Amino acid sequence: EDEVPVGAVIVKDGKIIARGHNRRMQNCDPTAHAEIEAIRAAAQRLGDWRLDGCTMFVTLEPCVMCAGAIAQSRIDTVIFGAFDDALGCAGSRANLPADPNVGGHAKCAGGLMKESCAEVLQRYFEKKRKE
């Protein structure tokens, strides 16, 4: 797949309940980010859009759309790898998942395996520039 290599998992009670990865190109859908895909899968699995008690792990800091969806889905914690200084909205540019003004209450922490996550993204974009 020729997608930006971002992946997300959602965990509840110590178990992975959903996974997602970017599928924008594959689905011709600008909303098919890893976080959105994982949120949709978790909601289906739990039979509830409220993802209270869940933690999301994602390789790249969520964008504004994904950060808003995280807030609206009531995920408790977001842990991400690489920071996105340009578009990140879970700490870099804003912190929407934690902002009560948009329904957020999540704790956000970035930098988990940030070098590895950033390297995967950097390699992908270097390859794309050569094509």
Q: Where are the regions a protein language model picked out?
A:
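Short, basic and Ser/Thr-rich N-terminal targeting/leader segments
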Residues: 2-6, 52
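Short beta-strand scaffold segments in enzyme catalytic cores
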Residues: 6-14
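Immediate flanking context of iron-sulfur cluster ligation sites
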Residues: 48-60
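Glycine-rich oxoanion-binding loops at beta->alpha junctions
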Residues: 36-43
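A short, polar/charged loop-to-alpha-helix boundary motif
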Residues: 26-36
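Zinc-dependent deaminase
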Residues: 1, 65-131
